[in-house]
């Protein structure tokens, strides 16, 4: 025997009336609690803002697959491309470094894996 679903009450998703949110009430359920973000970090005018980190690439250096001395600074001992956080590079610089490393690997200027 198959169970009959006709006599059961409709679920909250399949109601006959569409559900409309009351716009006068706030969207969040409990506004009496202080929000986590506001209480954890307060900005004080005396506190110094974050320090701009110095780029590891000098202004005259070109990010290019032929510049092996530059590329080797951003590769681990195993031959992997180091993360942007480790390299302390901007996003655009990290993309250019990754592209240069991949081109240099294909042209056999640097090894794919270094077994040290």
UniProtKB/Swiss-Prot annotation:
The keyword Cell membrane does not apply. InterPro entries: Ribosomal_bS18, Ribosomal_bS18_sf. This is Small ribosomal subunit protein bS18c. Gene3D superfamilies: Ribosomal protein S18. Keywords: Chloroplast, Plastid, Ribonucleoprotein, Ribosomal protein, RNA-binding, rRNA-binding. It comes from Cryptomeria japonica (Japanese cedar). PANTHER family: 30S RIBOSOMAL PROTEIN S18, SMALL RIBOSOMAL SUBUNIT PROTEIN BS18M. GO terms for biological process: translation. One of its GO terms (cellular component) is chloroplast. Residues 1-51 are annotated as: Disordered. Pfam families: Ribosomal_S18.
